């Protein structure tokens, strides 16, 4: 049966199986289980029956496990499923769970074509065995399905029409009104970074300074400071700009937190416990997160610092639990404090929260100039970060690895949602309860309420999203019914919040003109990859974001409208670029790009167009090249002869590491958080993540382009990356804009990769160094198999030994 595109939303209810065996005799499953139990020695177990929902081989839903009903399991569970898949069947698989996996009981097939008219289908479907024959008992499963094509969504391709837009549906946290948002590019913005960007109402964009604001927020706290991080390093100062010093600004972060705790402020920290940081690996661990060092620093102090492993929820098998606890991380990066009111003069306090991609650790402090060598005797002398070359050190000199990132501050009712997220996590994994009893602060702490008036032109509507499950958050509902009401996804005895992926999907589907993405990773939708040299079913990077992007572009091409997606990623994932894990991720990235370009090329050909596909989807990376200055820091040692480190030092160049996790849609809506565009971050049951989605209701792209703070922030980012502003950048959906950006990035790549350059690179935005054929194939650029100063293939290489779950 031919496959058809299901692009929209599936509503599915799985009711029950009528009978799994005939009469009272043993079924095939019973014999299988007896054999397994005897072989592995787990003893006789209780049948735990569950059902899965697949679009062909892509898992899109899973029920809870039903115990002690081996004959007639009844789930009565409903699912809200976003889909962007080509499929001929929706497959319902019935399984019995066991300690090392699951035993197949049978499959039922629902032809997709029966759903395309949008009518509700309620039926019993015959269950087939492994050989596609009816089961001996003639078992059937009762399901109800209804498909809503994406074009039936009232928000499809319409942007945010009014300030009454209610936010992303089916989520744990509702959208909050009357908020304030501050957006940060990099950890710091120096005074001489002043792009003149016009906003609505005759105003101009003003940058904010992330680590200065976090320093002020921590310093001002009187009652609580709550921090979560992938890494928190005590030995860093937050204030480093000699032109913007603050009283007490030279204090290190660890000492600042100790000082606040000594003042009576409740300081509680959840830092990811890198389980590789044991002696066999060295104390820093494979990830060098300083987790043990941070814990030891706060031992026997009033700071409550908990090393927090990524524990599995209780629903997985032994094998699944092992994967979660050893492969995945806590990746949320938040700070929550009580803070004075904006104009002071009151004993009242409010909640203020920070959410984004920047950990409070070494290697993160940087500015829009992203120096390689010039700050090695100042801001980066004691914070030299270069993990891409073995043995790199300040003694051996630059280039350091510059760090580009994005963060946000939220105020108003949304800040309380970030606080609640911390409380949920602490109550699950924080040990003894040291959380401040907020009821005791009723007279001091202003409850969740708007911080702007309804007619304030600068107000924001903001919604909090997460990737997290019941293994990391306390108080998730126990039943699928309650989980569904709370906007959560129920799995195999696991309750999951997967709303970050939902937020991206909804924003892409709403988009009208353009999308701008910066992300540390870009891979996924593996169900749509070419399968000529891999088994795509084993990859499991099933999140929809890349496919949603390409389908949006395809739809616009079909309608004769222009739509452009700009994506900025790092040259390679941080680490030694020749290593197997880095090469594997680059391979997944190439396959993702190729899948998207194939979609675009097919759509162009169907319309008889011979356009360059890079006019619709274009990938960039960031890099810098710095001429030697007199009086520059001189290293006392030299890198290894003929090493990539030495070549990069001699050529005065290196990538700027893109660690951002951000998407801007039509200059009216922005997502900022900790989540990468990969399966680890978007799954919900892998890495824990947090993000916020926000817009200004008085600055929407309705009749005229949006010219609020989201627009100003994008323009400031482009000024940072390109070193200039151009009138065409005001309208990224126009061909003039994408051609200008591509032309400048191509030129900067040529300068970056050239043998000699005796001046600073004029801009940081570089073409991602791959070619795109008119057939959509991703190829090497002529003479550019490897990244400069490395022997690492740009197109990557599939790994024969690393499991995909680790690198996707």
From Swiss-Prot:
<keyword id="KW-0378">Hydrolase</keyword>
<dbReference type="InterPro" id="IPR024632">
    <property type="entry name" value="PLipase_D_C"/>
</dbReference>
<feature type="binding site">
    <location>
        <position position="520"/>
    </location>
    <ligand>
        <name>a 1,2-diacyl-sn-glycero-3-phosphate</name>
    </ligand>
</feature>
<keyword id="KW-0677">Repeat</keyword>
<feature type="binding site">
    <location>
        <position position="370"/>
    </location>
    <ligand>
        <name>Ca(2+)</name>
    </ligand>
</feature>
<feature type="binding site">
    <location>
        <position position="404"/>
    </location>
    <ligand>
        <name>Ca(2+)</name>
    </ligand>
</feature>
<feature type="domain" description="C2">
    <location>
        <begin position="1"/>
        <end position="125"/>
    </location>
</feature>
<feature type="active site">
    <location>
        <position position="659"/>
    </location>
</feature>
<feature type="domain" description="PLD phosphodiesterase 1">
    <location>
        <begin position="326"/>
        <end position="364"/>
    </location>
</feature>
<dbReference type="GO" id="GO:0009395">
    <property type="term" value="P:phospholipid catabolic process"/>
</dbReference>
<feature type="binding site">
    <location>
        <position position="186"/>
    </location>
    <ligand>
        <name>Ca(2+)</name>
    </ligand>
</feature>
<dbReference type="InterPro" id="IPR001736">
    <property type="entry name" value="PLipase_D/transphosphatidylase"/>
</dbReference>
<feature type="binding site">
    <location>
        <position position="720"/>
    </location>
    <ligand>
        <name>Ca(2+)</name>
    </ligand>
</feature>
<comment type="similarity">
    <text>Belongs to the phospholipase D family. C2-PLD subfamily.</text>
</comment>
<dbReference type="Pfam" id="PF00614">
    <property type="entry name" value="PLDc"/>
</dbReference>
<dbReference type="GO" id="GO:0005509">
    <property type="term" value="F:calcium ion binding"/>
</dbReference>
<feature type="active site">
    <location>
        <position position="338"/>
    </location>
</feature>
<keyword id="KW-0443">Lipid metabolism</keyword>
<protein>
    <recommendedName>
        <fullName>Phospholipase D alpha 1</fullName>
        <ecNumber>3.1.4.4</ecNumber>
    </recommendedName>
</protein>
<feature type="active site">
    <location>
        <position position="661"/>
    </location>
</feature>
<feature type="binding site">
    <location>
        <position position="659"/>
    </location>
    <ligand>
        <name>a 1,2-diacyl-sn-glycero-3-phosphate</name>
    </ligand>
</feature>
<dbReference type="GO" id="GO:0004630">
    <property type="term" value="F:phospholipase D activity"/>
</dbReference>
<dbReference type="GO" id="GO:0046470">
    <property type="term" value="P:phosphatidylcholine metabolic process"/>
</dbReference>
<feature type="active site">
    <location>
        <position position="331"/>
    </location>
</feature>
<dbReference type="InterPro" id="IPR000008">
    <property type="entry name" value="C2_dom"/>
</dbReference>
<comment type="subunit">
    <text>Interacts (via C2 domain) with CARDA (via RGD or KGE motifs).</text>
</comment>
<feature type="binding site">
    <location>
        <position position="331"/>
    </location>
    <ligand>
        <name>a 1,2-diacyl-sn-glycero-3-phosphate</name>
    </ligand>
</feature>
<keyword id="KW-0106">Calcium</keyword>
<dbReference type="InterPro" id="IPR011402">
    <property type="entry name" value="PLipase_D_pln"/>
</dbReference>
<dbReference type="Pfam" id="PF12357">
    <property type="entry name" value="PLD_C"/>
</dbReference>
<comment type="function">
    <text>Hydrolyzes glycerol-phospholipids at the terminal phosphodiesteric bond. Plays an important role in various cellular processes.</text>
</comment>
<dbReference type="InterPro" id="IPR015679">
    <property type="entry name" value="PLipase_D_fam"/>
</dbReference>
<keyword id="KW-0479">Metal-binding</keyword>
<keyword id="KW-0442">Lipid degradation</keyword>
<feature type="active site">
    <location>
        <position position="333"/>
    </location>
</feature>
<dbReference type="Pfam" id="PF00168">
    <property type="entry name" value="C2"/>
</dbReference>
<feature type="active site">
    <location>
        <position position="666"/>
    </location>
</feature>
<dbReference type="InterPro" id="IPR035892">
    <property type="entry name" value="C2_domain_sf"/>
</dbReference>
<dbReference type="GO" id="GO:0005886">
    <property type="term" value="C:plasma membrane"/>
</dbReference>
<feature type="domain" description="PLD phosphodiesterase 2">
    <location>
        <begin position="654"/>
        <end position="681"/>
    </location>
</feature>
């Amino acid at each position: 049966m031919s496959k058809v595109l299901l692009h929209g939303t599936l509503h599915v209810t799985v009711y029950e199986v009528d009978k799994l065996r005939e009469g009272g005799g043993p079924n095939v499953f019973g014999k299988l289980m007896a054999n397994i139990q005897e072989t592995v020695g787990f003893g006789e177990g209780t049948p735990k029956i569950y059902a899965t929902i697949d679009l062909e081989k892509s898992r899109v839903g899973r029920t809870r496990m039903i115990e002690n009903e081996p004959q007639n399991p009844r789930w009565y569970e409903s699912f809200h499923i976003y889909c962007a898949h080509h499929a001929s069947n929706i497959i319902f698989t019935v399984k019995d769970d066991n300690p090392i996996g699951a035993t197949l009981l049978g499959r039922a097939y629902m032809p997709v074509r029966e759903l395309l008219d949008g009518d509700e289908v309620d039926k019993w479907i015959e269950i087939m065995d492994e050989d596609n024959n009816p089961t001996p008992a003639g078992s059937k499963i009762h399901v109800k399905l209804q498909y809503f094509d994406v074009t039936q969504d009232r928000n499809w391709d319409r942007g945010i029409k009014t300030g009454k837009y209610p936010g992303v549906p089916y989520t744990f946290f509702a959208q909050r009104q009357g908020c304030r948002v501050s957006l940060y590019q990099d950890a710091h913005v120096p005074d001489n970074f002043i792009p003149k960007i016009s906003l609505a109402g005759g105003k101009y964009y003003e940058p904010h300074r992330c680590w200065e604001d976090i320093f002020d927020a921590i310093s001002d706290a009187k009652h609580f400071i709550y921090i979560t991080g992938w890494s928190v390093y005590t030995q860093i100062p937050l204030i480093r700009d000699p032109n913007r010093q603050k009283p007490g600004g030279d204090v290190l972060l660890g000492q600042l937190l100790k000082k606040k705790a000594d003042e009576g402020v409740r300081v509680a920290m959840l830092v990811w416990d890198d389980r590789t940081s044991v002696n066999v690996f060295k104390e820093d661990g494979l990830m060098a997160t300083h987790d043990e060092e941070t814990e030891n620093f706060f031992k026997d102090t009033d700071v409550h610092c908990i090393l927090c492993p990524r524990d599995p929820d209780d629903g997985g098998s032994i094998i699944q639990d092992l994967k979660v606890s050893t492969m995945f991380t806590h990746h949320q990066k938040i700070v929550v404090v009580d803070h004075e009111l904006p104009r002071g003069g009151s004993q009242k306090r409010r909640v203020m929260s920070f959410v984004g991609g920047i950990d409070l650790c070494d290697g993160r402090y940087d500015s829009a100039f992203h120096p390689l060598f010039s700050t090695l005797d100042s801001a980066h002398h004691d914070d030299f970060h270069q993990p891409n070359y073995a043995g790199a050190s300040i003694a051996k000199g630059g280039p350091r690895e510059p760090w580009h990132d994005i963060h946000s501050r939220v105020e108003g009712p949304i800040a309380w949602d970030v606080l609640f997220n911390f409380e949920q996590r602490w109550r699950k994994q924080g040990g003894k309860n040291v959380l401040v009893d907020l009821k005791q602060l009723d007279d001091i702490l202003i409850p969740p309420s708007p911080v702007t008036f309804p007619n304030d032109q600068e107000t924001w509507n903001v919604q909090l999203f997460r990737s997290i499950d019941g293994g990391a958050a306390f108080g998730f509902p126990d039943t699928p019914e309650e989980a569904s009401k709370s906007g959560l996804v129920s799995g195999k005895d696991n309750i999951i919040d997967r709303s970050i992926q939902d937020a991206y999907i909804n924003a892409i589907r709403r988009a009208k003109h353009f999308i701008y993405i910066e992300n540390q990773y870009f891979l996924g939708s593996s169900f749509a990859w070419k399968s000529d040299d891999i088994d795509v079913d084993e990859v499991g990077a099933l999140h929809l974001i890349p496919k949603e992007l390409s389908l949006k572009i395809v739809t616009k091409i079909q309608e004769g409208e222009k739509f452009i997606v700009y994506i900025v990623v790092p040259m390679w994932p941080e680490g030694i670029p020749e290593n197997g894990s880095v090469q594997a991720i680059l391979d997944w990235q190439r396959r993702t790009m190729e899948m998207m370009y194939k979609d675009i090329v097919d759509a162009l050909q169907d319309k008889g167009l011979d356009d360059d596909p890079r006019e619709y989807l274009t990938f960039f990376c960031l890099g810098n090249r710095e001429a030697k200055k007199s009086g520059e820091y001189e290293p006392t040692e030299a890198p290894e002869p003929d090493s990539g480190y030495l070549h990069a030092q001699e050529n005065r160049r290196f990538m700027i590491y893109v660690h951002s996790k951000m998407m801007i849609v039509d200059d009216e809506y922005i997502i900022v958080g900790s989540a990468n565009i990969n399966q680890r971050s978007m799954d919900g049951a892998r890495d824990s993540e947090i993000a916020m989605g926000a817009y200004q209701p008085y600055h929407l792209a309705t009749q005229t382009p949006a010219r609020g703070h989201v627009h100003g922030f994008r323009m400031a980012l482009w000024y940072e990356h390109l070193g200039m502003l151009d009138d065409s950048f005001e309208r990224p959906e126009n061909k003039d804009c994408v051609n200008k950006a591509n032309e400048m990035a191509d030129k900067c790549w040529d300068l970056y990769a050239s043998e000699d350059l005796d001046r600073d690179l004029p801009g940081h935005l570089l073409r991602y160094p791959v070619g795109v054929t008119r057939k959509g194939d991703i190829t090497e650029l002529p003479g550019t198999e490897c990244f400069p100063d490395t022997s690492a293939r740009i197109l990557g290489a599939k790994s024969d030994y690393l499991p995909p779950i680790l690198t996707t």
